[in-house]
Amino acid sequence: MNGFSKLMLGTVQFGMRYGVANTTGKPSFEAAKSILKAAYDGGVTALDTAPEYGDSEELIGRALSELGLSERFKIVTKIPKLPAGCDAEKFIAESLEASLRRLRINRADAALLHAEVDFPYLDVLKSMVGRGLIEVAGVSLNTASHRDDGDVADCLQVPASLLDRRFDRCFGKGRHVFVRGAYMQGMLLMPEGKIFIPEVVERRRKLEKLGIPMAELALRFLFSKPGPKSILTGVETVDQLKENVRIAALPPLDENDLRKVEETAFPELPEMCVSPSFWSQYKKLHNIQ
């Protein structure tokens, strides 16, 4: 797998309102188009999308076509959770073909099983390489219970951040890793009073003592991970995109700062604290509205 930029643009925001820190909502078509142009100009030529991200795929296809950049980006899409009892090969092939039509491309650079429970169908997805629909196949992981499943995948998407270390063992194994959740859906960057998880507040206070802006620290830490990787960030504005590009041009953390960051990860926080998928459970458990 070659050609994936170190910074990757997440596009769920193009299709729906997303993220606990999102204050601007879904961008307009013209705004999203401007973000894509700014991404290309800034060397961010990898995109992450999925059929379940509203009209994200359609928007990308139209915008890149109008910009004349359809062949300039590496695009990763996903296969929705397979319905029980379906013909897996037929479902996966039809899903990919529909995504390619929406994206206005002939082949996706990578496709991931969106639901980790569908991992047994990875070989079926891999067979789509032979059909010319995708270049490589992988899986998007979400929970620690499935982290060992990815060892046979050509590529992985995993959540990771300054506080989420569940998938550290997935790095440095030669395959490409797409990393999402760098800012924990924006929670790491929110005003302290708006963070509803005290454990996150406590850890962030320790990280702030390093004297490095939190957004910068979050990305530079992930760029310090071993092996080939792309750090996925979603934005709602061109200015946010340009700031991420600026940070991506900075060097990884030095050994001293990296050691201090590592120290904040122990003891490891419960999955309920670091994974957005479990935040509704956290709120219910702690009676948070």
Model-assigned labels for residue ranges:
Residues T24-A38, G85-R104, L141-D148, A218:
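Short, acidic/polar
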Residues A50-E58, L82-D87, A115-P120, S161-D168:
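Acidic-and-aromatic substrate-binding clefts and catalytic sites of carbohydrate-active enzymes
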Residues L100-P120:
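Active-site groove signature of glycoside hydrolases
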Residues M1-E71:
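N-terminal binding-site loop/beta-alpha segment at the start of enzyme catalytic domains
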Residues L113-F266, Q281-Q289:
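Beta/alpha (TIM)-barrel catalytic core signal, keyed to glycine-rich beta->alpha loops juxtaposed to Asp/Glu
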Residues L9, A39, L47, I60, ...:
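Conserved, mostly hydrophobic/aromatic
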Residues F4-M8, T45-A46, E52, R72-K78, ...:
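Structural preference for beta-strand elements that scaffold enzyme active sites
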Residues G3, G61-K74, L100-R104, V129, ...:
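Acidic (Asp/Glu)-rich catalytic clusters
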